[in-house]
């Protein structure tokens, strides 16, 4: 599959980071590109027991053979960008990364407006990263672009051209989405959403490829969906129930405790349809069934875990190709060859 997109099927925090890291190392794509909103979404991955979190750069950074790209649709915060270059120095990221020269820039004034808005802070639950105000300025054609920032000059490129050239040459391209379907400005739980669309079609547009150039769309769901901030959550459980089940989590960017719910099959089916899913990935199966922890062979899954996967496939109507059974990169069941 020359190109594939990975997107979240719920409200973000589905575990896309660890899945993308696995795909980056397993499949060895020549290009790993990030779409999405900007620095309001964090992806975490564990490598040899150490946690790495990124908000700006592609999560597949550990694949040292890959070119890392940030698409034109993504907002760039220069401070975050350079911090991550330093944080990931051991992976030689600075020599492999390219930012599209058309990316809009998050400035300090955008973060100030974001944090000063009682509506965004109290009602919507903004992360305060400045993405909403920056996108508003972009729509009004007032935002600066990456090409206007001198410090970014060494990293500027035409991401769309690079990716399309790579596809013409038969190279493998992995494209990362951020956040999740339920936070889409168009299809999510408006107004409790992010500042742009988050579906696979939007992510393709972010990096500059047309729909006919996308070969596969992997939509990621976790066994117990979570949500940070305000907004409807039909299957939400009480905080006490989440604690009893050992499902206490905190947001990568905000540090706020995540709300937790039961798996919503109807929502998952709708999300998969609108994203054009060709395959599903299920993460944190070990939270649903502790006996699944670390299992790497589907046939060795406990009965409860296997029945859950089968129910998802039946009710959502899309095959489950990848299953994460723990936080480490090797905690995965890869069924893609059997589909």
UniProtKB/Swiss-Prot annotation:
<dbReference type="InterPro" id="IPR042109">
    <property type="entry name" value="Adenylosuccinate_synth_dom1"/>
</dbReference>
<feature type="binding site">
    <location>
        <begin position="284"/>
        <end position="286"/>
    </location>
    <ligand>
        <name>GTP</name>
    </ligand>
</feature>
<comment type="pathway">
    <text>Purine metabolism; AMP biosynthesis via de novo pathway; AMP from IMP: step 1/2.</text>
</comment>
<feature type="binding site">
    <location>
        <begin position="42"/>
        <end position="44"/>
    </location>
    <ligand>
        <name>GTP</name>
    </ligand>
</feature>
<keyword id="KW-0547">Nucleotide-binding</keyword>
<feature type="binding site" description="in other chain">
    <location>
        <position position="194"/>
    </location>
    <ligand>
        <name>IMP</name>
    </ligand>
</feature>
<feature type="binding site">
    <location>
        <position position="13"/>
    </location>
    <ligand>
        <name>Mg(2+)</name>
    </ligand>
</feature>
<dbReference type="GO" id="GO:0005525">
    <property type="term" value="F:GTP binding"/>
</dbReference>
<feature type="active site" description="Proton acceptor">
    <location>
        <position position="13"/>
    </location>
</feature>
<comment type="subunit">
    <text>Homodimer.</text>
</comment>
<keyword id="KW-0658">Purine biosynthesis</keyword>
<feature type="binding site">
    <location>
        <begin position="324"/>
        <end position="326"/>
    </location>
    <ligand>
        <name>GTP</name>
    </ligand>
</feature>
<keyword id="KW-0479">Metal-binding</keyword>
<dbReference type="InterPro" id="IPR001114">
    <property type="entry name" value="Adenylosuccinate_synthetase"/>
</dbReference>
<keyword id="KW-0460">Magnesium</keyword>
<dbReference type="GO" id="GO:0000287">
    <property type="term" value="F:magnesium ion binding"/>
</dbReference>
<dbReference type="Pfam" id="PF00709">
    <property type="entry name" value="Adenylsucc_synt"/>
</dbReference>
<feature type="binding site" description="in other chain">
    <location>
        <position position="179"/>
    </location>
    <ligand>
        <name>IMP</name>
    </ligand>
</feature>
<dbReference type="InterPro" id="IPR018220">
    <property type="entry name" value="Adenylosuccin_syn_GTP-bd"/>
</dbReference>
<dbReference type="InterPro" id="IPR027417">
    <property type="entry name" value="P-loop_NTPase"/>
</dbReference>
<comment type="similarity">
    <text>Belongs to the adenylosuccinate synthetase family.</text>
</comment>
<dbReference type="InterPro" id="IPR042111">
    <property type="entry name" value="Adenylosuccinate_synth_dom3"/>
</dbReference>
<dbReference type="GO" id="GO:0046040">
    <property type="term" value="P:IMP metabolic process"/>
</dbReference>
<feature type="binding site" description="in other chain">
    <location>
        <position position="256"/>
    </location>
    <ligand>
        <name>IMP</name>
    </ligand>
</feature>
<keyword id="KW-0342">GTP-binding</keyword>
<feature type="active site" description="Proton donor">
    <location>
        <position position="43"/>
    </location>
</feature>
<feature type="binding site">
    <location>
        <begin position="252"/>
        <end position="258"/>
    </location>
    <ligand>
        <name>substrate</name>
    </ligand>
</feature>
<feature type="binding site" description="in other chain">
    <location>
        <begin position="40"/>
        <end position="43"/>
    </location>
    <ligand>
        <name>IMP</name>
    </ligand>
</feature>
<dbReference type="GO" id="GO:0005737">
    <property type="term" value="C:cytoplasm"/>
</dbReference>
<protein>
    <recommendedName>
        <fullName>Adenylosuccinate synthetase</fullName>
        <ecNumber>6.3.4.4</ecNumber>
    </recommendedName>
</protein>
<keyword id="KW-0963">Cytoplasm</keyword>
<keyword id="KW-0436">Ligase</keyword>
<feature type="binding site" description="in other chain">
    <location>
        <begin position="13"/>
        <end position="16"/>
    </location>
    <ligand>
        <name>IMP</name>
    </ligand>
</feature>
<feature type="binding site">
    <location>
        <position position="42"/>
    </location>
    <ligand>
        <name>Mg(2+)</name>
    </ligand>
</feature>
<feature type="binding site" description="in other chain">
    <location>
        <position position="127"/>
    </location>
    <ligand>
        <name>IMP</name>
    </ligand>
</feature>
<dbReference type="GO" id="GO:0004019">
    <property type="term" value="F:adenylosuccinate synthase activity"/>
</dbReference>
<feature type="binding site">
    <location>
        <position position="258"/>
    </location>
    <ligand>
        <name>GTP</name>
    </ligand>
</feature>
<feature type="binding site">
    <location>
        <begin position="12"/>
        <end position="18"/>
    </location>
    <ligand>
        <name>GTP</name>
    </ligand>
</feature>
<dbReference type="GO" id="GO:0044208">
    <property type="term" value="P:'de novo' AMP biosynthetic process"/>
</dbReference>
<feature type="binding site">
    <location>
        <position position="141"/>
    </location>
    <ligand>
        <name>IMP</name>
    </ligand>
</feature>
<comment type="function">
    <text>Plays an important role in the de novo pathway of purine nucleotide biosynthesis. Catalyzes the first committed step in the biosynthesis of AMP from IMP.</text>
</comment>
């Amino acid at each position: 599959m020359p190109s594939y997109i990975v997107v979240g099927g719920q409200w973000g925090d589905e575990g896309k980071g660890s899945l993308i890291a696995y795909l980056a190392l397993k499949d060895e794509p020549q290009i790993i590109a990030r779409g999405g909103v900007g620095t309001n979404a964090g992806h975490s991955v564990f490598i040899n027991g150490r946690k790495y979190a990124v908000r700006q750069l592609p999560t597949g950074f550990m694949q040292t053979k890959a070119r890392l790209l940030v698409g034109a649709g993504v907002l760039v915060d220069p401070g975050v960008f350079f911090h991550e270059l330093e944080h990931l120095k051991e992976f030689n990221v600075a020599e492999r990364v390219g930012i599209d020269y058309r990316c809009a820039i998050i400035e300090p004034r955008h973060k100030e407006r974001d944090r000063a808005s009682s509506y965004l802070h109290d009602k919507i639950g903004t992360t305060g990263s400045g993405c909403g105000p920056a996108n508003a300025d972009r729509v009004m054609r007032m935002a600066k672009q990456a090409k206007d920032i001198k410090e970014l000059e060494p990293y500027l490129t035409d991401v769309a051209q690079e990716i399309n050239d790579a596809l013409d040459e038969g190279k493998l391209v992995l494209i990362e989405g951020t956040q999740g379907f339920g936070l889409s400005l168009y299809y999510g739980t408006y107004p409790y959403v992010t500042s742009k669309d988050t579906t696979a079609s939007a992510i393709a547009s972010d990096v500059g490829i047309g729909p006919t150039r996308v070969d596969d769309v992997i939509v990621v769901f976790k066994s117990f969906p979570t949500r940070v901030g305000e907004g409807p959550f039909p299957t939400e459980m009480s905080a006490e129930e989440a604690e009893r089940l050992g499902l206490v989590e905190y947001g990568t960017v905000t540090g706020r405790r995540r709300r937790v719910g039961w798996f919503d099959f109807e929502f998952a089916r709708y999300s998969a349809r609108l994203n054009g899913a060709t395959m599903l990935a299920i993460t944190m199966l070990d939270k649903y069934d502790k006996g699944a922890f670390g299992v790497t062979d589907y046939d060795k899954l406990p009965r409860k875990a296997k029945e859950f996967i089968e129910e998802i496939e039946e009710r959502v109507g899309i095959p489950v190709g990848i299953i994460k059974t723990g936080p480490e990169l090797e905690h995965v069941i890869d069924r893609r060859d059997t589909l």
